[in-house]
Every structure is written in structure tokens, then in C-alpha cells.
Amino acid sequence: MNKENKQELVAEMHDKLQRAQAVFLADFRGMNVGQATELRNELRKANAEYKVVKNTLLEIASKGTDKEGLNPYYAGPTAIALCYDDPVAAAKVLSRFNKENTNPFTLKAGVLTGKTINVADIQALADLPSREVLIAKMLGSMQAPASNFVRVLAAVPGGFVRALDAIRAQKEA
């Protein structure tokens, strides 16, 4: 790769690092080409991207971004997963893929909203419910008091109607 191509790659990676909401690094030793392709496809479905880039180029590309905290982890064979949408979905894909394929890679570290996170944090992120589930739970908890209030208001006239019906039935008998 000549100097011009490297500069283009660094500029492209710098842009991608700035746009990414989360970034995960992995040591991909033990992963074959078929597994890498499968992982790329799965991450693409989660609006994430999987790339293998030289460590020195990643280090240069991360300068001036909130991903500079990853610089100590650019050692050995390094793959990078860039998440542009939901970091939880990408972390779930990485975790599930690693379990299903007998550990083809080892997670090193990541960055989430500018903060460097370790492997345990990435696993905790993967264990969270999906974004849709969290939103549904939040909306359900916000809606519960209002629906309970409506139910109480509806019960008062309903009780009154049942009492009148009981009095009517008693007078008819």
C-alpha cells in the first residue's frame, strides 16, 4: 500500500471513527475468512461495520476523536467494529458470534460515547435488552399510572350503576 492509499484510508477511518457511536476492538487470531465474512454480514444488519486495519493507521486516524482512549489497545492483530446506530445490538452480535463459533476472537476494549470500556463492560452492554424493549418498558411504566387512574374513574360510575341495578332488582322481587 503506497503512501497516498494510506492517507486516504486514514482520512476514511478518521471520518468513520467520528461518526461511530461506539467502537469495539478485537484480536482476531483464530478466525478464518468464512467466519470474518459471516461476522461482517451480521454486524451490517445491526448498522455496524467490521474492518481489519493496521494498528499504526488506526492510531493516526483516531487522533482528534473521542476514540483516542483506544490507542494502548492497538497491538497485535486488531479488528475494529464501528457501530453507527445501536451499540447494544452490535455488542450482542459480537458476543453471540463469539459464543457460537468457539471464541474465534478476543475482545480487547471499546469506546462508548467517548468513554473507554473494558471487556466486562462490553459483555454487560451485550446483556442489556434491545433498544426497542427498553423503550417499550419505559413507555409501559409511564402509561401505567394514567391507565390505572382511568380504571379508577371508570369504576366509580360502574359501581353506582351496579348499585342502582341491585335496587331495581330488589324492588321488582
From Swiss-Prot:
Part of the ribosomal stalk of the 50S ribosomal subunit. The N-terminus interacts with L11 and the large rRNA to form the base of the stalk. The C-terminus forms an elongated spine to which L12 dimers bind in a sequential fashion forming a multimeric L10(L12)X complex. GO terms for cellular component: large ribosomal subunit. This is Large ribosomal subunit protein uL10. Forms part of the ribosomal stalk, playing a central role in the interaction of the ribosome with GTP-bound translation factors. Belongs to the universal ribosomal protein uL10 family. HAMAP family: Ribosomal_uL10. NCBIfam families: PRK00099.1-1. Pfam families: Ribosomal_L10. GO terms for biological process: translation. One of its GO terms (molecular function) is large ribosomal subunit rRNA binding. The lineage of its organism: Bacteria, Pseudomonadati, Thermodesulfobacteriota, Desulfuromonadia, Geobacterales. Keywords: Ribonucleoprotein, Ribosomal protein, RNA-binding, rRNA-binding.
